[in-house]
Each structure stands twice: as structure tokens, then as C-alpha cells.
């Protein structure tokens, strides 16, 4: 099977692309390399450099493909609040271009990279796929709109579609695949440490056990495995949505405790104001994906943070 992976040179996309290739899939990487890195795709021959908002480029990249895994997107929550037009243009407009190209090139399978940011704030112990969606940020709104587009166009066109709602992704399979975004908590801490600064905790006054946000963390390699099983499921699945997390919540302070253990340092974090668009608590219920796809995460929090730090130390 020939699979187009948009955003395939990104942090998550590279892990997904390599796993697909290891499992016998023919992979075409589509990336504009604005955030993706060439070093992550050095073992791929079929690379299409293009912008997801360029309809003609997307159409050309679709030639000869059997399925799509769509990860290409802008993803900084704070930036989406200050510049929502950029996010709607790129994330929703790009998804529209992709669906149009699929229709024109008779490609009828897609796995979409969605987000837990689509959900309404919740006090539930674990969020289920059927729970209310009312995103706090434009980023989350673009993911929800893209899900809806994929579902509705899929129904009209006869596509098989699955949207995977990621929770917080961390870790790395190898050095060159590490997360360089600096928007996510763990790489942001690494950057502050290397610069000799105290890392920040954004908000210590949330209604949680220690005042900091609670999040569900998943190892990026476990997430890549979820894409693989979702792709296989497209042979029978018509229109699916699945949470992808560990099913366990960790506070930001607990993450800092593990970071200090893995890095063997004292980080001395300082508390700052809340970031706009952040929910107090987001923990996944993963019962549906366990039942329907037979997928379960494997990595512990220690393994996630250890692998992230190993990649950070080895990065050039």
C-alpha cells in the first residue's frame, strides 16, 4: 500500500513514517519543512516538498497513493489565540485541499491527526469520545472543524476515515527524531535548562490536586503504533474517532519531578500566568481504541521522559 504522510518530517510524522516503512508500506513524505527536519527523513526516497495550503502541490502529491495519514498542521495553542486566521487557513484550508485531492485522485482512506484540544473543559476522571466538544482555543477549533470536514466529505465520497485525538505526546525513538518544537512542556524545559534559565510552570492556581494542569502523556512510539492499527482498520471502518493517550493523568509538577530524576538535576521551576486556551485537566478514556483496535500503550512516564532526554542530549 502507498501512503501519503503529510507532515511526515515532523516530530510525530517521522515516527509514524518510519514505522509504516518498517511494516512494508510505501511512504511518500509531504512536508514544507517549516518545522519538519530533513534529518528525520534521510532514509526516505519519496519526499514531496510542498505547502498543505497549495492546492496544486497537494493534488500532485496525491498521484498514485492508496491512503493518507494527515498530520500537517500548525499546533501552538497560544499562537492560535493571537493569530487565529493563520490557523484556520493552514489547518482547515489544508484539510480541505487534501480532501479535494483525494476525491480527484480516487484515494479513499484517511487517518487524521486530531487533538484532545477539541474537548470542552471537564471534571471527569477520563474523557470519552462522546463527551462534549467546545474547544477553548482556535487550534482546537481547527482540529474539530477538520474532523467534521473529513467525516462529512467521507460520507459523501465513500471514504473510510479515522480521526485520532492525541493527548500529550512525549519521548523519542532515536536522537534525530526528538521534539524540537519548544512549544510542548518537556522540550521547553530542556531549552530553559540548556540556557541556564528556570523553566516556567504556566498556572499554579488551577482547581487540581497541586494547582497545576493535569495531562495525559503518551510515548510518541505508542502513538505511531496507533496510526498503524488505524490504517489497517480502514479496510472495515467507515467513520471512526478514537482517543489516543495513556489513560493516566500527571500534573505538571509531577512531570517536573520525573524530569529532575531523568536529568539528574534540580530545575527550580517558577510559576507564571496561565496560558490562554489551556484546560485544567485532560485525561483520556482509551477503552474504545482498546476494544475496537486492540491497541494499548506500553511506555511508562519514566521511559517517556528518559527517551526524550536521551534524544535532547544527542541532538546537534
Question: What positions do the PLM features span?
Answer:
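Short-chain dehydrogenase/reductase
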Residues: 80, 88, 136-144, 167, 179-187, 216-217, 241-244
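Flexible, glycine-rich beta-alpha linker
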Residues: 119-120, 137-138, 162-183, 208
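C-terminal substrate-binding subdomain of Rossmann-fold SDR/epimerase-dehydratase oxidoreductases
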Residues: 193-316
Amino acid at each position: 500500500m502507498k501512503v501519503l504522510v503529510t507532515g511526515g518530517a515532523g516530530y510525530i510524522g517521522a515516527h509514524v513514517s518510519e514505522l509504516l516503512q518498517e511494516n512494508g508500506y510505501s511512504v511518500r513524505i509531504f512536508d514544507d519543512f517549516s518545522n519538519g527536519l530533513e534529518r528525520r527523513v534521510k532514509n526516505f526516497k519519496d519526499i514531496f516538498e510542498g505547502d498543505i495550503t497549495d492546492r496544486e502541490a497537494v493534488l500532485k502529491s496525491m498521484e498514485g497513493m492508496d491512503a493518507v495519514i494527515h498530520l500537517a498542521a500548525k499546533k501552538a495553542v497560544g499562537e492560535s489565540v493571537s493569530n487565529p486566521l493563520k490557523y484556520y487557513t493552514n489547518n482547515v484550508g489544508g484539510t480541505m485541499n487534501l480532501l479535494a485531492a483525494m476525491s480527484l485522485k480516487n484515494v479513499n482512506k484517511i487517518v487524521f491527526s486530531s487533538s484532545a484540544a477539541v474537548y470542552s473543559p471537564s471534571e471527569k476522571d477520563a474523557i470519552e469520545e462522546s463527551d462534549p466538544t467546545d474547544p477553548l482555543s482556535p487550534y482546537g477549533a481547527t482540529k474539530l472543524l477538520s474532523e467534521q470536514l473529513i467525516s462529512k466529505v467521507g460520507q459523501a465520497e465513500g471514504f473510510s476515515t479515522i480521526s485520532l485525538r492525541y493527548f500529550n505526546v512525549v519521548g523519542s525513538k532515536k536522537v534525530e527524531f526528538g521534539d524540537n518544537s519548544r512549544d510542548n512542556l518537556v522540550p521547553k524545559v530542556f531549552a530553559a535548562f540548556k540556557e541556564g534559565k528556570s523553566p516556567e510552570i504556566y498556572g499554579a492556581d488551577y482547581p487540581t490536586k497541586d494547582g497545576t494542569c493535569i495531562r495525559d502523556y503518551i510515548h510518541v512510539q505508542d502513538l505511531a503504533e496507533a496510526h498503524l492499527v488505524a490504517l489497517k482498520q480502514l479496510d472495515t471502518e467507515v467513520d471512526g474517532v478514537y482517543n489516543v493517550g495513556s489513560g493516566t493523568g500527571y500534573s505538571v509538577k509531577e512531570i517536573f519531578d520525573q524530569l529532575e530524576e531523568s536529568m539528574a538535576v534540580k530545575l527550580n521551576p517558577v510559576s507564571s500566568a496561565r496560558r490562554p486556551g489551556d484546560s485544567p485537566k485532560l485525561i483520556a478514556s482509551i477503552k474504545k481504541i482498546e476494544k475496537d483496535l486492540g491497541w494499548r500503550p506500553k511506555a511508562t512516564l519514566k521511559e517517556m521522559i528518559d527517551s526524550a532526554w536521551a534524544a535532547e542530549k544527542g541532538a546537534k
